[in-house]
């Protein structure tokens, strides 16, 4: 029997890196509302008392960067100096320039179908049938813990909570099946007045127990709740935040490979983002079709070239048909050229701020989570 542990982590919307991601994607959304053809690469840096928004943007749109940045920070919950960061009073610096004309000539084409990739690179997509959303369980539940922390904080159930938090879930496997939770780590920023005893009890009862399946918890499960004993200083006052530093949290929690490209602040012409979404869409449809229990897709692109330079399918011994057939089906049923995948997934819409916390995958509101190709894939593979 094969026994092992696997762990994934998540961070809250108030984590400094996630503040930066949300600001970058809020800028992208506001631009796409006005200018669907915009080219956006927006990066954000946050630290005590300041937010710096920079990058390369070519657009006909006008966005009030300062007010938008302040609104995002306040929406997250940083709206009073007591928290060490205040969206109303922090400095907002704007260092945005235009996208290089050298890149433009490689991407833009007279025929939209010939639109080239915005850069070279490799992208991975993954799906597994171990959860109902066809995502790895550890990252799924780590995200749900963070969503629950935000919910009880914002609704006032636990009014002493503050926006910055992290979670980590370690699952026990036997023969690749989950048999329980080995350990849970949950660290949450809090106000100075709450006792550690009350914090531990409240986090356990209001955050952990409502989220994790009861049948996975046992007397052997270990809980590490604010293990340093104090977490009052947090957010950008505790650590600086940068766009694109939580790429494993954003994807599969380490259960699949990653091409290295971050998502937030990038318009869909950047295949770092759009092709990673397409790869998830392909992998999820293969698993939903019952063609494999686990599936990983690798795509690669060359700057200025429309067609992928490679497509790889790996099913880790769980495939019901040969991987070579799956590659052929991917080529037949999915248009993975930049223009094709943007159209296939309807990516030119202002949906990106919502992706910037709690994971880009496994959330049914996003178009790359559809399984609308599953039946035709199964039929084409010859499975009844």
Curated annotation (Swiss-Prot):
- Per its UniProt record, what PROSITE patterns does this chain match? ADOMET_SYNTHASE_1 (PS00376), ADOMET_SYNTHASE_2 (PS00377)
Any idea which positions bind ATP?
A: 15, 164-166, 230-231, 239, 245-246, 262, 266
| Pathway given in the UniProt record | Amino-acid biosynthesis; S-adenosyl-L-methionine biosynthesis; S-adenosyl-L-methionine from L-methionine: step 1/1
Q: Any idea which GO molecular function terms this record carries?
A: ATP binding; magnesium ion binding; methionine adenosyltransferase activity
In short, the EC number is 2.5.1.6
GO terms (BP aspect):
one-carbon metabolic process; S-adenosylmethionine biosynthetic process
The record's catalysed reaction(s) read:
L-methionine + ATP + H2O = S-adenosyl-L-methionine + phosphate + diphosphate
InterPro entries membership: ADOMET_SYNTHASE_CS, S-AdoMet_synt_C, S-AdoMet_synt_central, S-AdoMet_synt_N, S-AdoMet_synthetase, S-AdoMet_synthetase_sfam
Would you identify the family this protein belongs to, as annotated? Belongs to the AdoMet synthase family.
Give me the residues that bind L-methionine, please.
Answer: 56, 99, 239, 270
In which residues is K(+) bound? 43
Segments for region (Flexible loop): 99-109
Q: What is this protein called?
A: S-adenosylmethionine synthase
Could you tell me what this protein does?
Catalyzes the formation of S-adenosylmethionine (AdoMet) from methionine and ATP. The overall synthetic reaction is composed of two sequential steps, AdoMet formation and the subsequent tripolyphosphate hydrolysis which occurs prior to release of AdoMet from the enzyme.
Q: Does the keyword Methyltransferase apply?
A: no
List the HAMAP family: S_AdoMet_synth1 (MF_00086)
The coenzyme or cofactor needed here is: Mg(2+); K(+)
Cellular component terms per the entry's GO annotation: cytoplasm
Cross-referenced CDD domains:
S-AdoMet_synt
Keywords per UniProt: ATP-binding, Cytoplasm, Magnesium, Metal-binding, Nucleotide-binding, One-carbon metabolism, Potassium, Transferase
| NCBIfam families, per the entry | metK
**Residues that coordinate or bind Mg(2+):** 17
């Amino acid at each position: 029997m094969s026994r092992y542990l696997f762990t994934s982590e998540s961070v809250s919307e108030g984590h400094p890196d996630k503040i930066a991601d949300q600001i970058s994607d809020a800028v992208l959304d506001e631009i796409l509302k006005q200018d669907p053809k915009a080219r956006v690469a927006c990066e954000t840096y946050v630290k005590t008392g300041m937010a710096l928004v920079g990058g390369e943007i070519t657009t006909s749109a006008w966005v009030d960067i300062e007010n938008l940045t302040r609104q995002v920070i306040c929406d997250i919950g940083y709206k009073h100096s007591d928290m060490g960061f205040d969206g109303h009073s922090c400095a907002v610096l704007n260092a945005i320039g235009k996208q290089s004309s050298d890149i433009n000539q490689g991407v833009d084409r007279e025929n939209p179908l010939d639109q080239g990739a915005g850069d070279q690179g490799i992208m991975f997509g993954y799906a597994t049938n171990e959860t109902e959303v066809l995502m790895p369980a550890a990252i799924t539940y780590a995200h749900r813990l963070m969503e629950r922390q935000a919910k009880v904080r914002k609704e006032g159930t636990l009014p002493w909570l503050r926006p910055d938090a992290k979670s980590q879930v370690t699952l026990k496997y036997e023969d690749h099946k989950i048999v329980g939770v080995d350990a849970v780590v949950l660290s949450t920023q809090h106000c100075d007045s709450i006792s550690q005893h009350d914090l531990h009890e409240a986090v356990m009862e209001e955050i952990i127990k409502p989220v994790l399946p009861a049948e996975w918890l046992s007397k052997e499960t270990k809980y590490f709740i604010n293990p340093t004993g104090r977490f009052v200083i947090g957010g950008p006052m505790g650590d600086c935040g940068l766009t694109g530093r939580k790429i494993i949290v954003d994807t599969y929690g380490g259960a699949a490979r990653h091409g290295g490209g971050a998502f937030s602040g990038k318009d869909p012409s950047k295949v770092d983002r759009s092709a990673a979404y397409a790869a998830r869409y392909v992998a999820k449809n293969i698993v939903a079709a019952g063609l494999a229990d686990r599936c990983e897709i690798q795509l690669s692109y060359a700057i200025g070239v429309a067609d992928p330079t490679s497509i790889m399918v790996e099913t880790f011994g769980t495939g019901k048909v040969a991987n070579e057939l799956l590659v052929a089906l991917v080529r037949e049923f999915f248009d993975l050229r930049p223009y094709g995948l943007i159209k296939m997934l309807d990516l030119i819409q202002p949906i990106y701020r919502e992706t910037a916390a709690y994971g880009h995958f496994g959330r049914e509101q996003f178009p790359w989570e559809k399984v609308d190709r599953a039946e035709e894939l199964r039929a084409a593979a010859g499975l009844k």
